[in-house]
Amino acid sequence: MFYQENFDVIVIGGGHAGTEAALAAARTGQKTLLLTHNIDTLGQMSCNPAIGGIGKGHLVKEVDALGGLMAEAIDHSGIQFRTLNASKGPAVRATRAQADRALYKTYVRSVLENQPNLTLFQQAVDDLIIENDKVIGAVTQMGLKFRAKSVVLTAGTFLGGQIHIGMENFSGGRAGDPSSITLAQRLRDRPFRIDRLKTGTPPRIDARSVDFSNLEAQPGDNPTPVFSFLGNRQQHPQQVNCFITHTNEKTHDVIRKNLDRSPMYAGVIEGIGPRYCPSIEDKVMRFADKDSHQIFIEPEGLTTHELYPNGISTSLPFDVQLQIVRSMKGFENAHIVRPGYAIEYDFFDPRDLKATYETKFIEGLFFAGQINGTTGYEEAAAQGLMAGLNASLFSQGKEGWSPRRDEAYMGVLIDDLSTLGTKEPYRMFTSRAEYRLSLREDNADLRLTEQGRELGLVDDIRWSRFNEKVENIEKERQRLKDIWINPTSENIDQVNSILKTPIVREASGEDLLRRPEVTYSSLMTIEKFGPASDDQQASEQVEIQTKYAGYIQRQRDEIEKSLRHENTKLPFDLEYNKVKGLSNEVVAKLSDAKPESIGIASRISGITPAAISILLVHLKKHGLLKKGK
């Protein structure tokens, strides 16, 4: 039976990728359906109760700059906020917040339920309706069929999900939820390259059984940083401390003695786990020279006693988990509320995706989130927003869009995935971006909001505030350029008091701000250069843009040089074996990857600059040299 209404976009899955995808499609005016196996778990934090971090916080700010939800949701549910790398340069500073799980999920659901153009429906999806290699809908568990022009699949760890606790294992998408077995089987019948990955979660602890007097308190920042460009500190709920403890030699001895009971070390789990978030048994074996590992004790919320011990993810049996937990300082009498576990699941080789997240084999089908081999809420949200946007554009018959590597971490993410693929769960770091000085948290809106407005993602409120901020930046920079001081000026002693070396020639406010020892706030203490701008975001930009102007310009020059042929299109049906001069290896790799552009081709492993030159000559010779947008 077909549902009586047709949709423009169907999103399958209500996690962090699915919610952003559904909201993006709906915000751009498309009639959108979000199918989830359980409406009560929309926006649920399946693993750690936190948003942001190095590289990840940058993605959250970019999602926000394009009108996404994640930053707004954490501002309303964050119970501890911190700026990481605060003493370092702006390129690597990152915001991180602990979340109250219940508040976060409630906020996400409220936004989804009140979003125009968006319909929610609770049913697991068992199959996709595909005709002539084009998706036209989805089939639910009870046989109900939904038609749509495009479909976004955000299945998380649910496709063929298998949960492991010791030698016991059972089917599940996460603890308490069923896995998508039928859909996983159907997708395996398609021409996708599919493999297995694994992730894990630690046991949850009852705070009432912990001796906090033996733990090191870790307070948040004061004043608290804000995630959303439209957010403010008044939105933040009550703030609390996190705590720190450590594993010890006793902990490690327990783990070593029970490795034969670990499904990972016994060969039961074949999927590869996240390199940068390994299980405690993996850490103990890989870093055998370390006597202890730091464990962050994170509260799960304001109205629960559950604690999340970040750093002891494990799939060891429950009795061993209990020994591990109770071996740590402060946890001698700890009670485990929920056991830790590992989960193994299907993922699809992201090299089978276009830069828009559309699959190369099935027209109108988009993948986002852990299905693409990534790990983390933030990576999922970024993919979800882009996939939802491009599914919307596809349903309207418009050309897709994705940012380049030099424009956004979102661009780095899809470029890495679609050109290099991944053999392990991929997480974002600032080190993955070659142009990170230009890709800062603080300028995500300046990089993306204008484009978001053109694409229909940015509403009037955000657009108005953005334009106000841009205007305030320009006005304040010009004001500082116009104020001059010289060695004989009336305020010279006051000026020299904030300088390492006194002024010997005439200088503008901008000249002074360029000096490493001068901050915007210290400059504003001098009467001649005050008062400070009322717009704190604008004044932050004035300082960063002024201090780093030379470096930023140098990076822009590098970007322009590298972009010369970045968007030169490569025909999908180009027969590389007929391009004279290409080696057999290059022909095989290009034929397999079918890159969309010269830029993407150049980043495929083994594709040499000489091969790129040969391709360009071939394109020109046959009248195929076309520049993309």
Swiss-Prot record:
Sites where the protein binds NAD(+): 273-287
Residues the entry annotates as binding FAD: 13-18, 125, 180, 370
Pfam hit, one: GIDA_C_1st
GO molecular function: flavin adenine dinucleotide binding
SMART domains: GIDA_assoc_3 (SM01228)
Keyword terms, alphabetized: Cytoplasm, FAD, Flavoprotein, NAD, tRNA processing
Co-factor(s): FAD
Quaternary organization: Homodimer. Heterotetramer of two MnmE and two MnmG subunits.
Cited function: NAD-binding protein involved in the addition of a carboxymethylaminomethyl (cmnm) group at the wobble position (U34) of certain tRNAs, forming tRNA-cmnm(5)s(2)U34.
PANTHER family in alphabetical order: GLUCOSE INHIBITED DIVISION PROTEIN A (PTHR11806), PROTEIN MTO1 HOMOLOG, MITOCHONDRIAL (PTHR11806:SF0)
Annotated protein name in UniProt: tRNA uridine 5-carboxymethylaminomethyl modification enzyme MnmG
